Structure formats: structure tokens, C-alpha cells
């Protein structure tokens, strides 16, 4: 592929689907804090004036679902009916039940190391050296834009902004290298009193320019700031939100394949989540080791079975050592059984709420972003 465009999008923490994700993961964290081996599958639905939290949980812990829900919505910034949603007055419905014993018998084993996968499925992980964090640039900068929107909103610098927002960035590539940004879209909810020209100028000066590198912007870059001209009704009043509806935003912005399983609200026994994190960890360490410029990992599992049913490594012709060496390096240096994933990445801890907005990958505070295996892989492959 010579010259081409590639686009990714992100959404803010105040987007309805992201409200749902954050509530689901806040519940998960609260349970894991008391019971690290709990089984949790928590789903959330939000709409005007109400939140419904449901799913299946097996745990010795007790958590206050209503208070967790209200506090999460409060932190996001929906604290007044003028915004279309109010953490203090919305209804909170709890419909959580217990996990099926049929599932549990396949997961729990006498030997913890033989813990079976919580479900069948396919999971992908990806890394590329086009950014320092080994993530695709389009999704990286889309996340940074909506993170900046939240920052200037919460600090009061742009106090007319409201929590709901979306971003989209189109990058120009030539021979696989970034040469510029072709288009930027940023839509943000706002109060009724601000004018569209004032909002557009403020967003350009306080959000877009501080985030996007100037060398990638030029006279031909197209900027679309609130292109409809008005975005007062937003959040759950504008659209209902559901856990797990932003799986491409959560991962690689479409630059890599996706197995279809969502992350939020699931404890680490669910390989939809833990194996996707492990696949990112493997791919990132391969790229960090200099074994390839780009790497995609696919893992697959059968319910109740510990070992993956398959491991696939794709390097898109960018490998620096033989494909067989890369495959063998993965098999010998990464324990990809469910128990191994949890131990390798220290997943039985309450770290998930902060993953639920602005992407699960490319953020150094998460254990699956470590490149601690890179030196080992270099030695294995004989890379100097």
C-alpha cells in the first residue's frame, strides 16, 4: 500500500456507552477489592433518568451497587438535570444474579494452574512502532482529544462544555509512514448559552492545537468542530448507553482485528478480557524487542480448557527474524493459560475502572503495557 488514509474515532467518558462501561468496571473493582477470585459479569444500561445494572456474580463480597453507580456518574460530571442526567436523582435498578454452576465447574479446578477458560472465543492483540507507545496513531490521538476535552471541562477552563463528546482523526500515510493529518472531527456537548463560533474557536485553541503535533497539520487539513452547529442534548438523554458497545474504541481503532468480545464488567477469568490483554502484551514485547515493526497476535480458547486452542502471529512482512523463531519465542516465554495470564499480568486487582474510558491499550500504568520481556525475546532471537 503506497499512499492511503486511515481513520479512528474515540468517545469521552461522558458518552452514554462509556458511562455504562465505567459503571460495570466500578462494580467489578469494588468486588475484586474484597474478593479477588470473584466471578463477575456486570452489564449496565443507561437512559434518561435511570441506570440498570445486571449480570451474574459469584462472590463473598457485598458492595453497594447504587452508591457505586451514583458516584461513578458524579465523577464523570452529570450532576444536574440541565445536563440531561443527574447522578443524585436518577433511578438505579439492580438486577444482578448468580453465575451458572454449569460454567463454574468448567473454570475452577483442584489445581489452580489448570483453571479452564471462562468461555470459548477468539482474541487479538496488536502493536506497531509508528508511535512511542507502540499503538496506531489514529486511535492514540483520537483518545488524546477527548481526554483533553474532559480536562478543560473539569478544570473550568471551558466551563460551557458538557461531558458527552466524540473525536475522529484521519491520518495520511505514504509507504506505511505518517506524513500528515487529513481530517479532524470533534463534537462536544455544550451549554445552551455558548455560540457556535465561540465554541469552535475555543475547541481549536484549547483542545485540538495543544494535542495534535503541528508538523502533521497543514493548510489542507480539514477541521470539523460540532459540524451540526448544536449539541446541547447529549449523554443518556440523547442516546441510551450499553456496556460493551465501543469495542473498537477500546482497542486499536480498527487498525487490527477484533474477536468480538467486550471487556468492561468482566473479571479476569473471562478470556475475552484477560487474553486480549495478554495478546497486546505479547505483541508489544515482540515489537519492542525489534523482532518486527508490526505484530498481531490471535489467541483462541475452549470453555473449561486451560491451554489455548491456537496461537497465531502475523507480522505483515515486517519481521526482522524468521517467523518460526517468533512463534517459538512466544510459546517458550509467555504462559497463555488463564491462570498464567492472571499471574503474568497481575490481573486479580481492582484496576479496571480506569480502563473503561480512553482505551485499554497504550497507557503505561497498566501491566499489559510493560515491555519487560523485550530483552528476553531479543536474546532468544539473537538480536544484538
Curated annotation (Swiss-Prot):
| EC top class named in words | transferase
Q: Which cofactor does it need?
A: Mg(2+); K(+)
- Which PROSITE patterns does this entry report, sorted A to Z? ADOMET_SYNTHASE_1, ADOMET_SYNTHASE_2
Which Pfam families is this protein grouped with?
Answer: S-AdoMet_synt_C, S-AdoMet_synt_M, S-AdoMet_synt_N
Region Flexible loop, residue ranges? 99-109
* Positions annotated to bind ATP: 15, 164-166, 230-231, 239, 245-246, 262, 266
**Keyword Cell inner membrane attached:** no
Q: Which reaction does it catalyse?
A: L-methionine + ATP + H2O = S-adenosyl-L-methionine + phosphate + diphosphate
Q: How is the cofactor bound?
A: Binds 2 divalent ions per subunit.
Membership in a protein family: Belongs to the AdoMet synthase family.
What PANTHER family does the record tag this protein with? S-ADENOSYLMETHIONINE SYNTHETASE (PTHR11964)
Descriptive protein name: S-adenosylmethionine synthase
Amino acid at each position: 500500500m503506497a499512499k492511503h488514509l486511515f481513520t479512528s474515532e474515540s468517545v469521552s467518558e461522558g458518552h452514554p456507552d462509556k458511562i455504562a462501561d465505567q459503571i460495570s468496571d466500578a462494580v467489578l473493582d469494588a468486588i475484586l477489592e474484597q474478593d479477588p477470585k470473584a466471578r463477575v459479569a456486570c452489564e449496565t444500561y443507561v437512559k434518561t433518568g435511570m441506570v440498570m445494572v445486571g449480570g451474574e456474580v459469584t462472590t463473598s463480597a457485598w458492595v453497594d451497587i447504587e452508591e457505586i453507580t451514583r458516584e461513578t456518574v458524579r465523577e464523570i460530571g452529570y450532576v444536574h438535570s440541565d445536563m440531561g442526567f443527574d447522578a443524585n436523582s436518577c433511578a438505579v435498578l439492580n438486577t444482578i444474579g448468580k453465575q451458572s454452576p454449569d460454567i463454574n465447574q468448567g473454570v475452577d479446578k483442584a489445581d489452580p494452574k489448570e483453571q479452564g477458560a471462562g468461555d470459548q472465543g477468539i482474541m487479538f492483540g496488536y502493536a506497531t512502532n509508528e508511535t512511542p507507545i507502540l499503538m496506531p496513531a489514529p486511535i492514540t490521538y483520537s483518545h488524546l482529544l477527548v481526554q483533553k476535552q474532559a480536562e478543560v471541562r473539569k478544570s473550568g477552563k471551558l466551563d460551557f462544555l458538557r461531558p458527552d463528546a466524540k473525536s475522529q482523526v484521519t491520518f495520511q500515510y505514504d509507504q506505511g509512514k505518517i506524513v500528515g493529518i487529513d481530517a479532524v472531527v470533534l463534537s462536544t456537548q455544550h451549554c445552551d448559552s455558548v455560540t457556535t463560533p465561540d465554541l469552535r474557536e475555543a475547541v481549536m485553541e484549547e483542545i485540538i492545537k495543544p494535542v495534535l503535533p503541528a508538523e502533521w497539520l497543514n493548510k489542507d487539513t480539514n477541521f470539523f468542530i460540532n459540524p451540526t452547529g448544536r449539541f446541547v442534548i447529549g449523554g443518556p438523554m440523547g442516546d441510551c448507553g450499553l456496556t460493551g458497545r465501543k469495542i473498537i474504541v477500546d482497542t486499536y481503532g480498527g487498525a487490527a482485528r477484533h474477536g468480538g468480545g467486550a471487556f468492561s464488567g468482566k473479571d479476569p477469568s473471562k478470556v475475552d478480557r484477560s487474553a486480549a490483554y495478554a495478546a497486546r502484551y505479547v505483541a508489544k514485547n515482540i515489537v519492542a524487542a525489534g523482532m518486527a515493526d508490526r505484530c498481531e497476535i490471535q489467541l483462541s480458547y475452549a470453555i473449561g480448557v486451560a491451554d489455548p486452542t491456537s496461537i497465531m502471529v502475523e507480522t505483515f512482512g515486517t519481521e526482522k527474524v524468521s517467523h518460526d523463531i517468533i512463534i517459538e519465542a512466544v510459546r517458550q516465554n509467555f504462559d497463555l493459560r488463564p491462570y498464567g495470564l492472571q499471574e503474568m499480568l497481575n490481573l486479580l486487582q481492582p484496576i479496571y475502572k480506569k480502563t473503561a474510558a480512553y482505551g485499554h491499550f497504550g497507557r503505561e500504568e497498566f501491566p499489559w503495557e510493560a515491555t519487560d520481556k523485550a530483552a528476553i525475546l531479543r536474546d532468544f532471537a539473537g538480536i544484538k
